[in-house]
From Swiss-Prot:
Subcellular location: Secreted
GO MF annotations in UniProt: diacylglycerol O-acyltransferase activity; trehalose O-mycolyltransferase activity
Gene it is expressed from: fbpB
Catalysis performed (reactions): 2 alpha,alpha'-trehalose 6-mycolate = alpha,alpha'-trehalose 6,6'-bismycolate + alpha,alpha-trehalose; an acyl-CoA + a 1,2-diacyl-sn-glycerol = a triacyl-sn-glycerol + CoA
Name by which UniProt lists this protein: Diacylglycerol acyltransferase/mycolyltransferase Ag85B
UniProt keyword Acyltransferase present: yes
Signal peptide bounds: 1-40
UniProt keyword Flavoprotein present: no
Organism from which the protein derives: Mycobacterium scrofulaceum
Similarity remark: Belongs to the mycobacterial A85 antigen family.
Function (record text): The antigen 85 proteins (FbpA, FbpB, FbpC) are responsible for the high affinity of mycobacteria for fibronectin, a large adhesive glycoprotein, which facilitates the attachment of M.tuberculosis to murine alveolar macrophages (AMs). They also help to maintain the integrity of the cell wall by catalyzing the transfer of mycolic acids to cell wall arabinogalactan and through the synthesis of alpha,alpha-trehalose dimycolate (TDM, cord factor).
Active site, renumbered: 166 (nucleophile), 270, 302
Length: 330
């Protein structure tokens, strides 16, 4: 085979993969709000509160689901996927997370809303199918919300964790990169770890258009804008290593197991994001990182069954890293 033939075949494969992704990803990245699991919602009777937290940055109150871990307890912020709803956080809809972390000594914080937001401060109003609103989620999560929780719920404003799925997995890492005193722990589950690279901006734009009719350019500008690299976890590895942030990074390979998630969209998307996670691990190790747990299982699809299992598995690590005192909060 000639060099030219090899190049043609290589470009053909790339075009095929890119076309498949472009056709399939709208609604797939949003599968991070996918099918509910059998264990959806925690049992009634837990001390879960529904807070209305004022946000000057967003010009409205933001609903936050909250379960106390006791006075001066560290916080775990559980961040939702691209199709975040306005009634409940996806972690509550799809898992019994409040049950799992009851009396863990960790305060569980679930912000509600933020569809397609990447939990970022957007350049422009977030205009979609439901109209326009202001997205200043990074400001809310790193300033307004921790101040409110400290003043009203006796939650530590520092030494916290951010754990996110899909869209919010990269967000959790970025929050920790730029706010290291608040977030000493970041968990990323099935995220695209290099959103600024290659077709990332285009595919994210397609997915956001499908999940609410939003535009990626309203968020971070054109793909050439520095905001894309600023919000790229792989590019920000030096900050994470320098901060000595504790990381928990998970990604399956698109093969379902007995946990479930056996459907084409969930299988395709998990396989699609896996390579960016492997590259992230390589870059992290090359940068001298030594404070991370990587789980790249030989099964797992882009669905809540696997993310819930990871949240359960990381509980002792969260408690140890954040210095929780089990038994608090009820």
């Amino acid at each position: 085979m000639t060099d030219l033939s090899k190049k043609v075949r290589a470009w053909g494969r790339r075009l095929l993969v890119g076309t498949a992704a472009a056709v399939t990803l709208p609604g797939l990245i949003g599968l991070a709000g996918g099918a509910p699991t059998a264990g959806a919602f925690s049992r009634p009777g837990l001390p879960v509160e529904y807070l209305q937290v004022p946000s000057a940055g967003m010009g409205r109150n933001i609903k936050v689901q909250f379960q106390s871990g006791g006075n001066n307890s560290p916080a775990v912020y559980l961040l939702d996927g691209l199709r975040a709803q306005d009634d409940y956080n996806g972690w509550d809809i799809n898992t019994p997370a409040f049950e799992w972390y009851y009396q863990s000594g960790l305060s569980i914080i679930m912000p509600v809303g933020g569809q397609s937001s990447f939990y970022s401060d957007w350049y422009s109003p977030a205009c979609g199918k439901a109209g326009c609103t202001t997205y200043k989620w990074e400001t809310f999560l790193t300033s307004e919300l921790p101040q409110y929780l400290q003043s009203n719920k006796s939650v530590k404003p520092t030494g916290s964790a951010a754990v996110g799925i899909s869209m919010a997995g990269s967000s959790a890492l970025i929050l920790a990169a730029y706010h290291p005193q608040q977030f000493i722990y970041a968990g990323s589950l099935s995220a695209l770890m290099d959103p600024s690279q290659g077709m990332g901006p285009s595919l994210i734009g397609l997915a956001m258009g499908d999940a609410g009719g939003y535009k990626a350019s309203d968020m971070w500008g054109p793909s050439s804008d520095p905001a894309w690299q600023r919000n790229d976890p792989t590019i920000q590895i030096p900050k994470l290593v320098g901060n000595n942030t504790r990381l928990w990074v998970y990604c399956g390979n698109g093969t379902p197991s007995e946990l479930g998630g056996a459907n084409m969209p969930a299988e395709f998307l998990e396989n699609f994001v896996r390579s960016s996670n492997l590259k992230f691990q390589d870059a992290y190790n090359a940068a001298g990182g030594h404070n991370a747990v990587f789980h790249f299982d030989q099964n797992g699809t882009h669905s809540w069954e696997y993310w819930g299992a990871q949240l359960n598995a990381m509980k002792p690590d969260l408690q140890g890293t954040l210095g929780a005192t089990p038994g608090g909060g009820g």
